């Protein structure tokens, strides 16, 4: 009942006014969008070489190396991002993709690998030295960037304990709503159930979806091997609640979601 109520009240419209929210109905279309078209051509950029020695910055705009389907190789997109960061002097002139890139978070995640060709509004970027001027340029000039966050991805968001202050990333520009889709081993009508987590990333610590997926597989195997089919469970320090949602789908009658934040 709880899960049905959540899905019933969920709309496909994000607070930004766009269709950022992933639902059971639009998930298949978003998964299909991850695939490149037959004309997408991969371009690999040397990660440890200064970017300004590899690409003419005068040519590097939103149309540079863009396929007719509207997608570009991820290396080209990140090169475009790095160019703007260099021009705004928040990283050195000899910056490289490996050492100076912000963390790119896919707005829609489904699989163990990041899509190599991405289209409009596909990324949320995070870097500790971003400012509003840089952020505006990134969302205005790089089509693939949907949102820009200021913060250290190595730090934990929210509250570490009950006495600590709430810590969030700062949303500087755009929208930071993201969706993670995780596969499970729960079978329903000949299909494996999937768990969809939609979140405004500035409020949450960065959690790697494959790691969460591995946790769900280990939990499933433990429950199956222990012949546990139902019961009451506590998802302590639940964060986004992936494990608790999984237990409800698995058949548990009651799950307590608990987190200090």
Model-derived segments and their meaning:
Residues 80, 133-134, 218:
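Exposed alpha-helical structural elements
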Residues 119-124, 145-149, 231-234, 254-258:
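Hydrophobic beta-strand segments of well-ordered beta-sheets in folded domains
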Residues 190-194, 198-202, 216-219, 225, ...:
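A short mid-domain helix/strand-loop element embedded in enzyme catalytic domains
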Residues 211-215:
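N-terminal pre-P-loop "Q-motif" helix
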Residues 217-261:
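Conserved SAM/SAH cofactor-binding pocket of Class I
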């Amino acid at each position: 009942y709880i899960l049905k109520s959540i899905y019933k009240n969920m709309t496909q419209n994000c607070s930004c006014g766009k269709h950022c929210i992933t639902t059971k109905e639009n998930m298949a279309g978003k998964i299909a969008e991850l695939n490149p078209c037959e004309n997408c051509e991969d371009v690999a950029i040397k990660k440890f070489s200064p970017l300004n020695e590899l690409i003419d910055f005068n040519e590097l705009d939103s149309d540079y190396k863009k396929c007719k389907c509207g997608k570009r190789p991820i290396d080209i997109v990140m090169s475009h991002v790095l160019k703007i960061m260099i021009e705004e002097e928040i990283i050195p002139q000899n910056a490289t993709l490996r050492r100076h890139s912000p963390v790119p978070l896919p707005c829609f995640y489904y699989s163990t690998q990041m899509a190599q060709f991405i289209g409009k509004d596909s990324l949320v970027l995070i870097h500790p030295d971003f400012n509003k001027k840089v952020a505006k340029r990134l969302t205005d000039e790089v089509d693939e960037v949907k949102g820009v966050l200021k913060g250290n991805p190595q730090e934990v968001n929210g509250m570490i304990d009950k006495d600590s202050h709430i810590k969030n990333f700062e949303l500087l520009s755009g929208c930071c709503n993201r969706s993670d889709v995780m596969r499970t081993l729960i079978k329903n009508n000949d299909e494996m159930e999937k768990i969809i987590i939609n979140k405004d990333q500035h409020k949450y610590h960065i959690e790697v979806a494959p790691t969460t997926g591995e946790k769900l597989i280990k939990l499933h195997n433990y429950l199956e091997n222990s012949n546990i089919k139902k019961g009451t469970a506590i998802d302590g320090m639940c964060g986004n609640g992936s494990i608790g949602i999984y237990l409800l789908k698995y058949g548990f009658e009651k799950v307590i979601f608990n987190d200090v934040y």
